[in-house]
Amino acid sequence: MNSTEVDNLPFQQQLTSFVELAVAKATGSPITTLFTIIFLILSYDQLSYQINKGSIAGPRFKFYPIIGPFLESLDPKFEEYKAKWDSGELSCVSIFHKFVVIASSRDLARKILSSPKYVKPCVVDVAIKILRPTNWVFLDGKQHTDYRRSLNGLFSSKALEIYIPVQEKYMDIYLERFCKYDGPREFFPEFRELLCALSLRTFCGDYITEDQIALVADNYYRVTAALELVNFPIIIPYTKTWYGKKIADDTMKIFENCAAMAKKHINENNGTPKCVMDEWIHLMKEAREKHSEDPDSKLLVREFSNREISEAIFTFLFASQDASSSLACWLFQIVADRPDIVAKIREEQLRVRNNNPDVRLSLDLINEMTYTNNVVKESLRYRPPVLMVPYVVKKSFPVTESYTAPKGAMIIPTLYPALHDPEVYDEPDSFIPERWENASGDMYKRNWLVFGTGPHVCLGKNYVLMLFTGMLGKFVMNSDMIHHKTDLSEEIKVFATIFPKDDLILEWKKRDPLKSL
């Protein structure tokens, strides 16, 4: 290729071709050639960053050539994220080969989340390797829409009612354990174990053993640790990403075996559904037998393989484990620190149960817990577990009139600023459950980005509110929670989602639910 031909290429291809031409024509010693190549690579890296950055906020130059702020990304800090959001509605960084655009305003976040023509989820850069490229979350267009519609029945009101008994059983087991602990302890790991057990029993029922639950609960943190926002481009043996992929593969193998047992229970033994796997297989069976003309049922006529089921169930665990653990930590810390809220929850719990604390949970009962539900919603707004949702740009994306995100860039809509918008939420940095009693449209709709929006909005949003409303009510009614505050209690630690920096030091004591409030 000669210089005239190079001039006719797009700019970034010109840069690449320029390097090739320079190397081909380089003369002199090997050392001179080497330094020439290094200089050209570094120049290309900086120029590429400048072209991609355009007019949006971000460092003027890549201070650390090639790697960018990679070392900072290994230890993410909430304060640094917030500074980036405050720097402009669009900002950027560049790490290794990946150019990252961050959108901090509500409207831009909604635009990105609702633009499947231009973007698709990538979770984080390495997620496709850990969750597998065949996983349904990475499907695009009609394939994704159809697959997602086939899962809607797993989170219908009818299905949610099925899951409550096993959830309540494990709530009781863990609450009794918490109350037997001698003195205060860190509850970040305790809540991770509790939520993992609740999720696995909800998803897999009795097909998964106690030993397997313990194994997944003990090891799952390696998956979380592997899914940093930006990783080294390849998986290196015995690194965090390598261990994360191994644990993910081992867990999905357990789920495959559970799916096989669920198929036998539903298809061969005509059993009734008791967990998510049962309900999915039951819906497939029902669709085949009835030859339903309902569009959603038609999608279930085909037989989903055990592998497909295992991958989908793993995404449910992936989506729920860290976010629900985060919600549990903040929710119980916040409530334990506010005796007025505790009193209101206890009053409501006895009222909806007609003063019988032994009444078991049901969907109708949970739906009556208006105040308790408002406390959960306010916790999700005040300390949203998920700060941002990474996407990859499929083709040049005109995000604003003045900026187009380049193909291949990672683009990240952030959720936190919309949930702390003072124009929508009065005193946004205060915890006020009562704000939800007369909520405005924007509070519920345009700014309520806790579960995302658009084609990838969280499937389990009603499941989350049901689970935590029921659990908060039971735990507060039947126990006293003592929060041992430290200077770090209100500081935010980022570990995939967000947690109190001191890992939440709690002490539990059993109480008579009928005693005076």
Swiss-Prot record:
The chain crosses the membrane at residues 21-41. InterPro entries: Cyt_P450, Cyt_P450_CS, Cyt_P450_E_grp-IV, Cyt_P450_sf. GO terms for molecular function: C-22 sterol desaturase (NADPH) activity; heme binding; iron ion binding; monooxygenase activity; oxidoreductase activity. Its EC number is 1.14.19.41. Heme binds at C458. It is a single-pass membrane protein. Keywords: Endoplasmic reticulum, Heme, Iron, Lipid biosynthesis, Lipid metabolism, Membrane, Metal-binding, Monooxygenase, Oxidoreductase, Steroid biosynthesis, Steroid metabolism, Sterol biosynthesis, Sterol metabolism, Transmembrane, Transmembrane helix. It catalyses: 5-dehydroepisterol + NADPH + O2 + H(+) = ergosta-5,7,22,24(28)-tetraen-3beta-ol + NADP(+) + 2 H2O. It is found in: Endoplasmic reticulum membrane. Its cofactor is heme. Pathway: Steroid metabolism; ergosterol biosynthesis; ergosterol from zymosterol: step 4/5. Its main location: endoplasmic reticulum. The third module or late pathway involves the ergosterol synthesis itself through consecutive reactions that mainly occur in the endoplasmic reticulum (ER) membrane. Firstly, the squalene synthase ERG9 catalyzes the condensation of 2 farnesyl pyrophosphate moieties to form squalene, which is the precursor of all steroids. Belongs to the cytochrome P450 family. PANTHER family: C-22 STEROL DESATURASE ERG5, CYTOCHROME P450 26. This is C-22 sterol desaturase ERG5. It comes from Candida albicans (strain SC5314 / ATCC MYA-2876) (Yeast).
